[in-house]
């Protein structure tokens, strides 16, 4: 593509290019874990999806679960023990695991043993070893395991990946991205498990940093081979009696063929997020790609030419559930599968090791 044709980059590109056939029916979901994200984002997204419906809620709080069951017309409410015992397995086809990170493996493996497909929140687990066990359990059971990454279904991000592959910005040289989100709960409350390293597996890096990390891998179509990182530990006292986690993480990733990426994640700075791909001939900038409900703002430049695009707002969480259900109903292998989650955790572990040792670590 030359500079004169760059304006055609966003002409009539499909918003759901992953959907190449019709999907009949709806996937009945059991939602395991009813924390803030499940209540505020996931359950409303499932309600807005044309291919999903929630039939079962799993929680340690019966009162909360019953209230939400009434709100979202869920037929069954069970405890975690009841879910493990398989009390209402006939009521759902797939399981959405939205528990704190340390419990992802446990409930994914329970679901696989029940023969249910799994959409598991990111990060897939708190360690590579656990994540690999989850992948093996689902493969042995013959069920789908999708890591709940939203960016693979966001139309503008998918289009930017196509433009990079098509060489619109030349050869990709560098990806930079950041995700800063000030945690609204700065107190050491029970619901603030993200500040407990034994439950979260880390802090800002494993919670927010996986977004620019995973999106860089997605756009480049490659895995990092080396990592260098620094972290700043939370000293605010918000962690309470928990082990302190990093409030900020800055990392650099080396990819094959001399390509690299830099990323930043933060719990304690002004909330903002960006992703930029620099190539030998131009660049692509995505404004606010990680926010959940996004404006699809993209700027593409090549030489002296420049074009911009702003689509209709997209709820990435709705797109994520729609995509997962489509994959289950059509037998399609999801692109952010379990092994994708393992690859990110392998990089995250290298990032943490590098920050601790103060030197580059091979991934």
Language-model segment annotations:
Residues 1-22, 58, 63, 69-75, ...:
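C-terminal helix-rich "cap/oligomerization" subdomain common to oxidoreductases
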Residues 240-246, 254-319:
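NAD(P)-dinucleotide binding in Rossmann-like oxidoreductases
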Residues 34-35:
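Glycine-rich Rossmann-fold phosphate-binding loop(s) that bind the pyrophosphate
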Residues 44-52:
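A short, Lys/Arg-enriched amphipathic alpha-helix followed by its capping loop at the start of a domain
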Residues 151-238, 358:
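Predominantly a Rossmann-like dinucleotide-binding segment in NAD(P)-dependent oxidoreductases
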Residues 94, 100-101, 105-150:
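Beta-strand-loop-alpha-helix segment that lines the small-molecule cofactor/substrate pocket
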